[in-house]
């Protein structure tokens, strides 16, 4: 996603490096220690020389359901519109919603998160999609429990 305004003097774009998921506990165990999908920040000021600036990752330790098979953990999707703010709203499967500030594109910082409880009989949440309306209301979709409607107050 291209950001429609410069941030810290740079024209940036964001991308999510989505990974395959483990189908069972044994496969999840083999993947232990590997990096998960993350949020990438690129300088796209010169399209002929796109440069990676940074990546934002979430540790498995940040979610009690990160290793709940047959689930997924890692970046999945982000809200695909940035109007005049530097906040990026990302879904992280079992890591829930992550709100990341890219005001410093070299060092993105998490400023908020929400992890829904899994649905009954589900090993962990699988947060799948996020949308944010013009009022700042967050609509978070999980494959199990369904829809969460949230508000976020940016820290001062």
What function would you assign to each model-found segment?
Residues 1-156:
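Feature marking well-ordered beta-strand scaffolds used for ligand recognition
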